[in-house]
Amino acid sequence: MVKLRLKRYGRKQQPTYRIIAIDVRCRRDGKALKEVGFYDPLKDKTQLNVPAILTLLQHGAQPTDTVSHILQKAGVFEK
């Protein structure tokens, strides 16, 4: 099963995240199947590849709770 989850990047105390599609059996920072976005919680910036996200969701990918909250704030589920 494929999930949309956050992959941590950045320095100590300054996290940034990439939103990735990854198999559930892989670790958090493992090899991603596809990178579909970027999230910076300190600057509250989000960059999303909406067509790729919608395609993955149609093919059965499940977002984690945090990623689904980010997608709702960006208005992806309204499209």
Swiss-Prot record:
Subcellular location, principal: plastid
Protein's UniProt name: Small ribosomal subunit protein bS16c
Subcellular location: Plastid, Chloroplast
TM spans (from-to): none
Record key words, sorted: Chloroplast, Plastid, Ribonucleoprotein, Ribosomal protein
Gene Ontology biological-process entries: mitochondrial translation
Organism: Staurastrum punctulatum (Green alga)
Single GO cellular component term: chloroplast
InterPro entries tied to this protein: Ribosomal_bS16, Ribosomal_bS16_CS, Ribosomal_bS16_dom_sf
